[in-house]
């Protein structure tokens, strides 16, 4: 079995692959102050619930956009799994991803892993949208090379900025509103955040297609992918565990 960890700024997604299938997965809050023992005990508890043991795991691979958390996770892997974790961007593992980008070192590990998984499954050209703390758009060109992208504030950041900086506006939940025109302040905010974000997605995808002169398949991943994709006119496929699949694929190709 392979244990995979996708560490984001807000959430960390964990998964176990058995014979190529994602059999278990969990989403936890990212805590950059946790020690290796706290991570070990948390994972032990999650494993116990699914009747898994540390001994079942034969490999560990990590993608992280939060550098301070890596030391604790790598030590946890050694102490609890007795395995040296593979770390995307740090361990000398090949990703088998072609690059048409001037400085590949600045690309986030999660974006690389997503691109590996998406190109393996869907070919090219592609637009990969990852709805995380930041929303990222990655363009894979006709030669199946990573060719750049767009980074915008995530929907949660946009929502928090609204109520944090406007003293009379309340905190709201992200959900589809009943109408576009709100009849209350909360309804108006919900509509603005939700439909404003969908407009951003559809608008940026159209601009990418127009600029590149291609008709790429558009893949969405991340915690809010299903919610946004349901109303978006431009998203073709939702892959909620794209990053976990990419980690598994990279590990398998290197072993």
UniProtKB/Swiss-Prot annotation:
One of its GO terms (biological process) is coenzyme A biosynthetic process. It holds the Pfam family Pan_kinase. Substrate binds at residues 101, 108-111, 185. Its cofactor is NH4(+); K(+). Pathway: Cofactor biosynthesis; coenzyme A biosynthesis; CoA from (R)-pantothenate: step 1/5. It catalyses: (R)-pantothenate + ATP = (R)-4'-phosphopantothenate + ADP + H(+). One of its GO terms (molecular function) is pantothenate kinase activity. GO terms for cellular component: cytoplasm. The active site is at 110 (proton acceptor). Its main location: cytoplasm. It is an enzyme of class 2 (transferase). Keywords: ATP-binding, Coenzyme A biosynthesis, Cytoplasm, Kinase, Metal-binding, Nucleotide-binding, Potassium, Transferase. Its EC number is 2.7.1.33. Signal peptide: none annotated. It is found in: Cytoplasm. A monovalent cation. Ammonium or potassium. Transmembrane segments: none annotated. ATP binds at residues 6-13, 133. K(+) binds at residue 130. Catalyzes the phosphorylation of pantothenate (Pan), the first step in CoA biosynthesis. Belongs to the type III pantothenate kinase family. Homodimer. NCBIfam families: baf, PRK13318.1-6, PRK13321.1. This is Type III pantothenate kinase. It comes from Oceanobacillus iheyensis (strain DSM 14371 / CIP 107618 / JCM 11309 / KCTC 3954 / HTE831).
